């Protein structure tokens, strides 16, 4: 047991986590050279395409150290993006140490900081590593000082390596063995295993990634899931060397996968504890804190026949992604679908793409909203996650919107631009500290503004140098209104948005103009209106297509022309009474982009 090392790799986006993990696998011979690919651990097609890590993955490697001993290294690759920070906290719960990878050219960024603090709170040993020293722009000395300055951990003798060229990777492995403590646990105690992750395999059912804290787990053991009390037999278990390898048992301190033939998706919730059915452990392990979704959007299948398939797909995805929340919803315009909760806009895009790719569905998304706290006139507090659920204007005493505490790290040159952006997003400054050339800004900004496009705008105003980390802070009273969209006088529930009173005029106008571009012309006029309550704030009209009925009159009497035009007008009027408007998918997407340009 003293030869086991469990660790994960934390870093900001694009600082080279996945490449470093490739090198570690290669040096320890986990895969032959033929099977080696770039970013082995980013196994999802989508991850490879976007070049980001979404799911935490685990690998078990054997490393023969310089002291002649062979160590078993279990490591978990984690995502770096702020939307997936919950994946990081889950991975850290299974480890004793973490490698803090910092790009020697870019220096410390906000996410590095956030994940690092999470690790320190969990009492992990944090080992700083300076990556990308092969780049001409690398300044390892400056960055090492920056790490000490901002993060506050000792970084003078930090390992320097280049994951791309393989330089210094051996030093990294030696450092892991020397600096990270061995797991503590009692092999004789009753089994306690923490479920770090689970996913659905079409042949095996639910596969769970577990970390054995105490005791050991053997094939054919009867185990109990502590939250549900269900008992299962262990069919197969093993480790990843990125490939799934079967073994006969998992010992204390190890990380591996278990298949118990669980068919039900809710059978093995993430963060749960497994124990033996006979003389098992009394109490469960402390799991991770449940994450609250920050952004909600309606997802609807384009054809209503897909509803069942859509429901199953969501179930399977939510098993793999503990932070996805969903409940059934129906809309007059779009039929039956689900209201889903996400951690941020990137998370929402990823989930939608995974549903469309992996499960072959066509989906329409409505505009994303955050959760508002509403105090009604009858002194009730309700939480509203969709514009349709907002009570009527005269029943609302006050609407409180969620405020996010944003920590931004930005080079001093771009400070002005970033502050201007924060003010435009209705932010209030909390704190500002200079660390050498970097400035740490703390702002309170409404969540609705942050999740919409704050990240993209921040990157573009600072030429990509600023970095952001945010978390929910509190609810605060604010003057919010619901803007409804009417087509020919009928409300379209799926198009409503909640926005701040000051911006409602411009938002409404933009919305209407955008919709006008995307609705195809019909045989009659379509009036698109934006309204707050009964007050119309903007309107535009999609003009009708009409036949030239006067083409066959050469010269002739004016009353003849009038008659023909009047006849046409009456026909159009009749048409308009029974006609309904088809809304293309683009019209819904247009709403997502309102206020971005």
From Swiss-Prot:
Function of the molecule: Required for accurate and efficient protein synthesis under certain stress conditions. May act as a fidelity factor of the translation reaction, by catalyzing a one-codon backward translocation of tRNAs on improperly translocated ribosomes. Back-translocation proceeds from a post-translocation (POST) complex to a pre-translocation (PRE) complex, thus giving elongation factor G a second chance to translocate the tRNAs correctly. Binds to ribosomes in a GTP-dependent manner.
Species of provenance: Vibrio vulnificus (strain YJ016)
Family per record: Belongs to the TRAFAC class translation factor GTPase superfamily. Classic translation factor GTPase family. LepA subfamily.
Classification via InterPro entries: EF-4, EFG_III/V, EFG_V-like, EFTu-like_2, G_TR_CS, LepA_C_sf, LepA_CTD, LepA_IV
Gene behind this protein: lepA
Enzymatic class: hydrolase
Main location: membrane
Catalytic activity reported: GTP + H2O = GDP + phosphate + H(+)
GO BP term, pick one: positive regulation of translation
Family matches, as PROSITE patterns: G_TR_1, G_TR_2
Annotated EC: 3.6.5.n1
CDD domains, alphabetized: EF4_II, EF4_III, LepA, lepA_C
Listed GO MF terms: GTP binding; GTPase activity; guanosine tetraphosphate binding; ribosome binding; translation elongation factor activity
Name of the protein in its database record: Elongation factor 4
HAMAP family per record: LepA
Gene3D superfamilies noted in UniProt: 3.30.70.240, Elongation factor 4, C-terminal domain, Elongation Factor G (Translational Gtpase), domain 3, P-loop containing nucleotide triphosphate hydrolases, Translation factors
């Amino acid at each position: 047991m003293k030869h086991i090392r469990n660790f994960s790799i934390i870093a900001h986006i694009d600082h080279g986590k996945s490449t470093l993990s490739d090198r570690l696998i290669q040096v320890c011979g986990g895969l032959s050279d033929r099977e080696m690919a770039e970013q082995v651990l980013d196994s999802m097609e989508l991850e490879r395409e976007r070049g980001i890590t979404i799911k935490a993955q685990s690998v078990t490697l054997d490393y023969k150290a310089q002291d002649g001993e062979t160590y078993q290294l279990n490591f978990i690759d984690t995502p770096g993006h702020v939307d997936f920070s919950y994946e990081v906290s889950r991975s850290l719960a299974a480890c004793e140490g973490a490698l803090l990878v910092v790009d020697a050219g870019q220096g410390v960024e906000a996410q590095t900081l956030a994940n690092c603090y999470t690790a320190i709170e969990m009492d992990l040993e944090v080992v700083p590593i300076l990556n990308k020293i092969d780049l001409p722009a690398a300044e390892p000395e400056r960055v090492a000082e920056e790490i000490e300055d901002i993060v506050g951990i000792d970084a003078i003798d930090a390992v320097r390596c280049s994951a791309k060229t393989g330089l210094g990777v051996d030093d990294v492995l030696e450092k892991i063995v020397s600096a990270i403590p061995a797991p503590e646990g009692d092999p004789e105690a009753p089994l306690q295993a923490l479920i770090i992750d689970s996913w659905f395999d079409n042949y095996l059912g639910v596969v769970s990634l577990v970390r054995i804290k105490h005791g050991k787990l053997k094939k054919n053991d009867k185990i109990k899931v502590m939250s549900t009390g269900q008992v299962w037999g262990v069919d197969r278990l093993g480790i990843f060397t990125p490939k799934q390898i079967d073994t006969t048992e998992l010992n204390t301190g190890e990380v591996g996968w278990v298949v118990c033939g669980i068919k039900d998706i809710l059978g093995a919730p993430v963060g749960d504890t497994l124990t033996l059915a006979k003389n098992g452990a009394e109490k469960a392990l402390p799991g991770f804190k449940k994450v609250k979704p920050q952004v909600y959007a309606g997802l609807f299948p384009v054809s209503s026949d897909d509803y069942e398939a859509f429901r199953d797909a969501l179930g399977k995805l939510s098993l793999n992604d503990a932070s996805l929340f969903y409940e059934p919803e129906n809309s007059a315009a779009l039929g039956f679908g689900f209201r889903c909760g996400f951690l941020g806009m990137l998370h929402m895009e990823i989930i939608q793409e995974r549903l469309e790719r992996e499960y072959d569905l066509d989906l329409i998304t409505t505009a994303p909203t955050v959760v508002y706290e509403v105090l009604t006139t009858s002194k009730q507090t309700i939480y509203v996650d969709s514009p349709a659920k907002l009570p009527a204007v005269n029943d609302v005493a006050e609407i409180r919107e969620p405020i996010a505490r944003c920590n931004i790290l930005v080079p001093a040159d771009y400070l002005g631009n970033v502050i201007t952006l924060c003010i435009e997003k209705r932010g209030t400054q909390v704190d500002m500290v200079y660390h050498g050339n970097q400035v740490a800004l703390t702002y309170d900004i409404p969540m609705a503004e942050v999740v919409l496009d704050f990240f993209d705008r921040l990157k573009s105003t600072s030429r990509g140098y600023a970095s952001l980390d945010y978390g929910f802070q509190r609810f605060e009273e604010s003057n919010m209104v619901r803007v409804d969209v009417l087509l020919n006088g009928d409300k379209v529930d799926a198009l409503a948005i909640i926005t701040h009173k000051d911006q409602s005029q411009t938002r409404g106008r933009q919305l209407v103009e955008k919709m006008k571009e995307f609705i195809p012309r019909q045989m009659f006029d379509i009036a698109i209106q934006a309204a707050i309550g009964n007050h119309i704030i903007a309107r535009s009209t999609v003009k009708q297509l009409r036949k030239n009925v006067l083409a066959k009159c050469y010269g002739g009497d004016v009353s003849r022309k009038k008659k023909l035009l009047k006849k046409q007008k009456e026909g159009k009027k009749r048409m308009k009474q029974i006609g309904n408007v088809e809304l293309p998918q683009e019209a819904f997407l247009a709403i997502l982009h309102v206020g971005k340009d």
